[in-house]
Structures are given as structure tokens and as C-alpha cells.
């Protein structure tokens, strides 16, 4: 198991229109509520590390030594019946990505990390309730939380 987390950020090889470098806003009084041990194992992340001060800095996006390239992603989509050519992560920072024990590359994203380049009125932080929905992941394989 790793007691630190080495991440790549393959998205930064894309043209700059697809992302903006973003640093998570400071989070006071960070603590662990629960840990998804199965996911931590898949990601090869030591649970003891996640509970440590270094792990808490990582989980809050504040470990600049290992996260020099955190970003927010841009995307397009329909909103209120109209195509909006530039939307983006208004309250999420992509810390990086890594190839897991099963050979699949997975993104590590901090949800509710504060305002980003793409933020609008209600964006920024996330309460424990909405984050819990991601944690339980409702059997959707595309989202799960450590």
C-alpha cells in the first residue's frame, strides 16, 4: 500500500480550452468521517495515510508537493433548453489520475473544493448531504468516493 499518492494529470496534455489550473480553497477543521476501504484498496492507498495529517492535506487538495497540476475541467452542454458552449466544474478540482490495481485509469476529484474559474452563483462548497450521495454512489460505477 502507498503511504503517499503519486498522481498524473493526463488532461493537461489537452489544449488549454479544456481545463483551467485550479487550487482548492482552504478548508478549516478537516477530519475523516468515513473511508471507503474497498476503493482505497483498489487505488492502492493506505488507510492509515488517509487518516494522517498528510492524508488529510491530500484529501482537502492542500498538498502542493504532490498536486502541482490540479485543474477544473471545461465542458459544453444544454442548459435550460439552450446549448451552452462553455460550462465547467464550478465546485470540483481534479487532483489527478492514476492507473489502479485493476489496470483501469481513474480520476481523483475533490468535490466541493470551493469556487473555480467555471463557478457561477451557487457554486463552490458542497454540504455533507450531497457528498454522501456520491459516497454511496447508488450503484453507478462512474462515481464513488474514498
Provide a role label for each language-model segment:
Residues 1-135:
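Nucleotide/phosphate-binding site architecture used for ATP/NTP-dependent chemistry
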Residues 136-142:
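Conserved small/polar residues in nucleotide/adenosyl-binding loops
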Amino acid at each position: 500500500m502507498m503511504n503517499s499518492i503519486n498522481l498524473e494529470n493526463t488532461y493537461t496534455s489537452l489544449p488549454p480550452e479544456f481545463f483551467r489550473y485550479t487550487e482548492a480553497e482552504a478548508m478549516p477543521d478537516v477530519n475523516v468521517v468515513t473511508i471507503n476501504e474497498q476503493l482505497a484498496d483498489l487505488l492502492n492507498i493506505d488507510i492509515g495515510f488517509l487518516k494522517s495529517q498528510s492524508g488529510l492535506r491530500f484529501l482537502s487538495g492542500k498538498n502542493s508537493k504532490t498536486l502541482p497540476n490540479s485543474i477544473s475541467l471545461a465542458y459544453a452542454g444544454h442548459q435550460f433548453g439552450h446549448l451552452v458552449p462553455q460550462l465547467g466544474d464550478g465546485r470540483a478540482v481534479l487532483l489527478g489520475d492514476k492507473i489502479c490495481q485493476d489496470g483501469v485509469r481513474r480520476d481523483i476529484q475533490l468535490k466541493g473544493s470551493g469556487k473555480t474559474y467555471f463557478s457561477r452563483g451557487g457554486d463552490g462548497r458542497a454540504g455533507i448531504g450531497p457528498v454522501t450521495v456520491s459516497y454511496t454512489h447508488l450503484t453507478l460505477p462512474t462515481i464513488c468516493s474514498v
